[in-house]
Amino acid sequence: MLTSLDYYRVFYYVAKHRSFTRAAEVLTTSQPTVTRTVKNLENDLGCRLFERDRRGVVLTAEGELLY
């Protein structure tokens, strides 16, 4: 599947703000949409881009390379 540039845009804002919620606010969309988009990108690339916890997100080694 060809990954949309919008996926990378969402990834960029999540990585920049270290938060799905803050990225959603900046992108004026919902947090579930941001989460789903990142999940789709991770599935397309075949790797995890973020480690998630209740305090936010941290880039994985693969995420660092993409960022």
What are these regions (language model features)?
Residues 4-7, 31, 63:
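The N-cap/first-turn positions of alpha helices
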Residues 7-14, 66:
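Short alpha-helical "packing" element that flanks the helix-turn-helix/winged-helix DNA-binding module
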Residues 12-30:
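Short helix-boundary/capping micro-motifs
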